Amino acid sequence: MTVTAYIALAVLAIMIYLIIKQYETRLVLLGGGLILCLISLQPMQGLHSFATNMVNGSLITAICSAQGFAYTASYTNCDRSLVYYLSRPIRNLGLFLIPLCAIITFFINIAIPSAVGVGAVVGSTLIPLMLRAGIKPAAAAAAVLSGTMGSLLSPGLSHNAYVSEMAGMGIMDLISYHSVYSFMIGGVAAVGVFLVCMFLGDHKGEKVDVNNTDDGFVPSPIRALVPLVPIVLMLVCTVWFPELKMGVTEAMLLGTIACLIVAHPDAQIFSKKFFQGMGDSYGEIMGIIISAGVLAAGLMASGLIDALIKVMVASSDVARWGGSFGPFLLSIIMGSGDAGAMAFNGTVTPHASEFGMSIEGLGSLAFLAGACGRTASPIAGITILLAGLAHANPFDVVKRTIAPMFVATILLAIFMV
């Protein structure tokens, strides 16, 4: 390796330390990338990458429209209605609430692709439900946390848009490609957390009388259907009416219109919520993609990626395990399933064919493994949120998820590529 490649390794180590210390992820990615470009005497590479990713049309439209729809569904309580009706039949199932709550969260997360968003909505209902049944707080939080990988099957997930564009295929085609593996790790998570909680005796806790805040919420069966509208539209049009070319943006806009018609809220506030969601998603999600792109440019300029690719070309097993456990470990350390997977997919995945893999295969492997790592991270935002809702320690929560996620990552590496 070159001198700059060794410097890049040192910079990466410092970046990981800063992220562990809870420095702002986008700042660390952006700063590290620009420093590497400067050290490599190619300062414009990082700036060009920033400018290019800022206007990535297919990513912006899919991500921003999906988040805009999610904000309107939250404002009109359509998401809470969906959770309410899905959770009613399972109130008295005792220990079996753990896998069932994980499964319910998984499917709701497909409709609401934000892990933190679905955690707030689902957790506020299902966690008190489990606490009342005598399930320990850490186990209740872990059950919901293990279900937050349903977004892998959502057309609004940024990774689906990113990898599908790189592979030159439609978003629904990519989801169809990795759906079996996404369901596999979802099943491993639900069953695995259930077994760990049973081993730890988490169903033998005291029944807690949790009083939900009476905020005037009244569930509506019609509103409960609204979060499902975009997904149903895309599935129906993809299978039976492909000539309509129903994209993510069109489906999300139609879902937003359905939300407005069904809930008939204050139209002005509704409009503000939609565009607030679009703006927030650009800053939060696109911000990570843009910053990861700058880091990717820095790693390329330093020569570290070229050295890594040579190693992977020499052995496909290195690519298989590196593409799975690399993002998995980075996501545990960073507390984000996005940053590590985005950096890997922006640098290594475009060269997948050189070590006998497809772009969609390696790219999907990276972000599925990244999701597993985030679900096993005590510093992930969703873990901290759910631990707070359950009044549990985040480390006690991931004690129940890390083993199933480790097993899921091994299975991905074995079967996916």
Identify the residue ranges that each predicted region occupies.
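Alpha-helical transmembrane segments
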Residues: G57-I63, L174-A190, L244-L253, G361-G370
